[in-house]
Design a protein with these regions (language model features):
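Eukaryotic intrinsically disordered, low-complexity regulatory linkers and tails enriched in Ser/Thr/Pro
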Residues: 3-460
């Protein structure tokens, strides 16, 4: 079913049949230019904004169709709406009359809704949209940015959609707290920054509660996981650990064991139970065991509780048979099928050839592990956006990933560092393929080269 959106102060949308929902129509003039800046077409036209597209029917009978996923940036100013496309074309809409504000807001809102659908992948909603006024950079020495917005709370994320500009995603695991201050909602992030939403009216307290409840539920899940992992653990240790361990973020096994003694051994047993034992043993024998990170995310559904477990193992050795410059990402859940191990470069290949594990990239390995985790969190741990070939991103089936890649720099970085994936066939074949991939990685010259199984050895 299509998503129905309201544009402007009056909910004017209508159906054209076959699932097409028109948000608004208006007359205007447009100018379309190519990547070289030369005008391709300029004419008066009738514009039609739909849930996922903008179309123009010119006076001479020609038409132009623009998917919202193909629009990279928009800017509305001085009664003109300017948009740049993924193919380098630029579009200017003007002479819109009294529909200017509605069209500008409608395009921005529709693009934000599209991006939310693409990134959050149908994640359940805790609290439906609440209108308010966003204040950012509200420090004494800064002039705050103020604009109207909508706030929506999902299962693991707070989404803020400014009236002008792209939506702001705030994972609950990145939040330090939420409070009511001077009749406004203040959301504080772990990095020390914050933003404020005012003019919420009667929705102020319900919105605060929805965010606070989501944060509390995540913390309780972490505590339950730790207690389940080490039943004899001291409650004080679990309480202290829950302040540092966040859902969706992998934690160093050494640190975890310091916070909750016995958790390292218990986690190894848990990995064995999740059929990750052989992978864990081999990868940590190749990599730096004390730098290994593990993450657990517990999800609940009608079928019961599922633990999603993942590993990051940095492999940095330059010795024969263990050549590294890679981070191994291994993941599984109880209902997972078609498992694979994913590998990402740590350093540019030229740097590794020149300096080995003494290069500057390896000196900041923890930051690179953090960056890899953040990228996976940004795409809700979906793996398809990582390994799909560039050409497939332009097919209708995977267009949502193309839009996400344009808008999420962490995903672009992850794809740029992606070496390849090794499918779990049988243990011996998997180990052979891992060795082959690592050897390829240290011998390849260009950073954009990816590993693939030899012809006749399917990796699907």
């Amino acid at each position: 079913m299509p998503v129905l959106l309201a544009v402007g102060t009056q909910n004017k949308y209508y159906h054209l049949g076959k699932g097409i929902v028109v948000l608004m129509e208006c007359s205007l003039r447009f100018s379309l230019a190519g990547p070289d800046g030369m005008t391709i077409k300029a004419d008066d036209a009738k514009a039609r904004l739909e849930v996922d597209s903008l179309s123009l029917v010119a006076n001479d009978g020609t038409s132009h169709f623009f998917s919202l996923r193909d629009i990279v940036t928009t800017r509305s100013q001085d009664f003109r709406i300017e948009a740049t496309m993924v193919n380098g074309q630029s579009l200017v809409l003007f002479k819109i009359g009294d529909k200017y504000e509605d069209l500008a807001k409608g395009i921005n809102r529709s693009r934000n809704e599209q991006l939310i659908r693409d990134l959050l992948m149908q994640e359940p909603v805790r609290k439906q949209s609440v209108p308010g006024e966003l204040r950012m950079g509200a420090h004494e020495e800064q002039k705050p940015l103020i604009c109207k917005c909508e706030v929506r709370v999902y299962q693991s994320t707070v989404a803020i959609m400014p009236e002008k500009g792209e939506f702001i995603r705030l994972p609950l695991s990145n939040l330090a707290g939420v409070s009511v201050e001077k009749f406004s909602l203040t959301i504080r992030k772990e990095d020390g920054s914050f933003l404020t939403v005012g003019k919420l009216g009667r929705e102020l307290e319900p919105l605060r509660k929805a965010i606070a409840d989501g944060m509390a539920e995540q913390t309780l899940r972490i505590k339950a996981l730790l207690k389940d992992l080490v039943p004899e653990a001291d409650p004080i240790n679990i309480e202290n650990a829950s302040r540092l361990i966040k859902e969706g973020k992998a934690v160093n096994l050494v640190l975890l064991d310091q916070l909750v003694p016995g958790s390292w051994m218990a986690m190894e047993k848990r990995l064995e139970g999740a059929d990750l034992g052989p992978q864990y043993q081999l990868l940590t024998s190749l990599g730096i065991k004390e730098k290994t990170r593990v993450g657990i995310k517990r999800t609940r559904s009608e079928e019961g509780t599922t633990d999603y477990i993942w590993l990051f193992v940095p492999i940095t050795s330059t010795s024969s048979g263990k050549a590294g410059n890679a981070i191994a990402f291994e993941a599984s859940s109880e209902d997972d099928t078609g498992r694979a191990t994913y590998f990402f470069r740590i350093a540019p290949r030229e740097e590794f050839r020149r300096s080995g594990a003494e290069g500057e990239s390896f000196a900041d390995l923890d930051r690179i592990l953090d960056r890899t985790n953040a990228a996976l969190e940004a795409i809700n741990f979906r793996r398809e956006p990582i390994y799909l070939e560039e050409g497939k991103l332009y097919t209708p089936e995977y267009s949502r990933y193309r839009y996400a890649m344009m808008k999420v720099p962490e995903l672009r970085d992850l794809r740029a560092r992606f070496i390849g994936r090794v499918i779990h066939s049988d243990p011996l074949q998997w180990a052979t393929d891992v060795s082959d991939l690592l050897s390829f990685n240290v011998s390849a010259k260009d950073d954009d080269q990816r590993w693939a199984k030899k012809e006749g050895e399917p990796n699907e």
